[in-house]
């Protein structure tokens, strides 16, 4: 909103400093600072309100150290992250940008699904919360929206550079050094010729049906990352801190992929209008860091499914629109290993029960962070070490820009 306001003012006046709103770097920094302030300011007041209203989730007895102390801590803190991300984005971003619209839809939609889940747990006293099938329906709906938008919107393109490229637009023939291409290509990390075209994955499938395969893949990615973030949210500060690290990396990737100079220098896919996403990313990072102010050990508030489902969907959609979704197992390695530990635990238990009649466990408890708790590690040490691993994975993800 402020972008359009100051653009309008600048058209009729020459007030010094107004032109700075044209720069993405300034608006991204402003969004980060504002989101941090909003989350800290709003967090303090919501904690008081939630405690007064007894908005807290029942704690399952898992025989973990310090578990009983968390019974009185309010939940639904994801509202803080969502508000602190959405408000700065509305103020500083170009709201007509298709990528900004997709991310706003994603965080609000999955935040609403998570809110309903938390509401049922808190006010209906049902520890199961929203039935899993309804969460899946929400994730599928978001995947369909994202997939169809990226395929059928005319302004979602990549720009290919060359020399003397003939471009036909509106019946006019021009010679450029680039052309905008409507494609479903993505990036494969660590490979020299690192572009993968989804339309060539199934060569025997008619091209007019390729969008169905693409949408199904988008649904899988969004569901996987969203549930991964949800599983990771088991220790104070773990999901928020990890998400801030991932969000910072995605902000850098969005900016360089949407900047013609950096993209050509790094020889990566250039996506017009994508750099605007850096504003959403920095707002998201600021919101997560501000939430950590109250969520680090010992936590004063939990994000609940309101936060974890929204965070996971945002990270997934960001990776998809930046065309870095195949990097998710590396960049979101913490979410990935937490999810994998649950799959291994359940699968191994079922296998041993079927084979030997007695179910055995691979880990002392899943997800993986609870395994380390059972081994006697303090909660804050586990979280800090997971953050360190997350930082290393983020650096490796950025290294893929040049290492091929």
From Swiss-Prot:
Q: Name one GO biological process term.
A: cell wall organization
GO CC, sorted alphabetically, is: plasma membrane
Key words of the record: Cell cycle, Cell division, Cell inner membrane, Cell membrane, Cell shape, Cell wall biogenesis/degradation, Magnesium, Membrane, Metal-binding, Peptidoglycan synthesis, Transferase, Transmembrane, Transmembrane helix
> Where is it located?
Cell inner membrane
Q: Superkingdom of this entry's organism?
A: Bacteria
Q: Which reaction does it catalyse?
A: UDP-N-acetyl-alpha-D-muramoyl-L-alanyl-gamma-D-glutamyl-meso-2,6-diaminopimeloyl-D-alanyl-D-alanine + di-trans,octa-cis-undecaprenyl phosphate = di-trans,octa-cis-undecaprenyl diphospho-N-acetyl-alpha-D-muramoyl-L-alanyl-D-glutamyl-meso-2,6-diaminopimeloyl-D-alanyl-D-alanine + UMP
Its membrane topology: Multi-pass membrane protein
Q: What is its main location?
A: membrane
Question: A single GO molecular function, which one?
Answer: UDP-N-acetylmuramoyl-L-alanyl-D-glutamyl-meso-2,6-diaminopimelyl-D-alanyl-D-alanine:undecaprenyl-phosphate transferase activity
Q: Enumerate the transmembrane spans.
A: 30-50, 73-93, 100-120, 132-152, 209-229, 242-262, 274-294, 301-321, 326-346, 381-401
Q: What cofactor does its activity depend on?
A: Mg(2+)
Q: Provide the protein name.
A: Phospho-N-acetylmuramoyl-pentapeptide-transferase
Please tell me the species this chain comes from. Amoebophilus asiaticus (strain 5a2)
């Amino acid at each position: 909103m402020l972008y359009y306001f100051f653009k309008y003012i600048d058209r009729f006046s020459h007030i010094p400093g107004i032109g700075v709103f044209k720069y993405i770097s300034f608006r991204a920094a402003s969004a980060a600072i504002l989101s941090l302030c909003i989350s800290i300011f709003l967090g303090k007041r919501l904690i008081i309100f939630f405690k007064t209203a007894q908005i807290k989730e029942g704690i399952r007895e898992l025989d973990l150290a310090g578990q009983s102390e968390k019974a009185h801590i309010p939940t639904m803190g994801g509202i803080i992250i969502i508000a602190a991300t959405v408000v700065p984005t509305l103020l500083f971003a170009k709201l007509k940008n298709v990528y900004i619209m997709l991310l706003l839809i994603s965080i609000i939609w999955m935040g609403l699904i998570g809110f309903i889940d938390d509401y049922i747990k808190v006010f209906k006293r049902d520890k199961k919360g929203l039935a899993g099938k309804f969460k899946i329906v929400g994730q599928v709906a978001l995947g369909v929206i994202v997939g169809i938008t990226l395929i059928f919107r005319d302004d979602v393109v990549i720009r290919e550079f060359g020399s003397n490229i003939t471009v036909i637009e509106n019946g006019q023939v021009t010679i450029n050094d680039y052309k905008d291409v409507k494609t479903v290509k993505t990036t494969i990390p660590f490979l020299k010729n690192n572009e993968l075209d989804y339309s060539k994955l199934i060569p025997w499938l008619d091209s007019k049906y390729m969008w169905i395969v693409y949408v199904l893949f988008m649904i899988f990615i969004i569901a996987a990352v969203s549930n991964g973030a949800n599983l990771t949210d088991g220790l104070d500060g773990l999901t928020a801190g990890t998400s801030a690290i991932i969000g910072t990396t995605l902000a850098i990737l969005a900016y360089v992929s949407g900047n013609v100079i950096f993209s050509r220098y790094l020889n990566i896919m250039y996506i017009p209008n994508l750099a605007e996403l850096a504003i959403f990313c920095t707002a998201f990072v600021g919101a997560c860091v501000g939430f950590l102010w109250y969520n680090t050990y010992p936590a004063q508030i939990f994000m609940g499914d309101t936060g974890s489902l929204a965070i996971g969907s945002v990270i997934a959609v960001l990776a998809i629109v930046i065309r870095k979704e195949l990097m998710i197992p590396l960049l979101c390695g913490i979410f990935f290993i937490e999810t994998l530990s649950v799959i291994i635990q359940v699968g191994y238990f079922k296998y041993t029960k079927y084979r030997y009649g007695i179910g055995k466990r691979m880990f002392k408890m899943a997800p993986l962070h609870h395994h380390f708790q059972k081994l006697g590690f303090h909660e804050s040490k586990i979280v800090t070490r997971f953050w360190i691993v997350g930082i290393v994975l983020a650096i490796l993800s950025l290294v893929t820009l040049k290492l091929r």
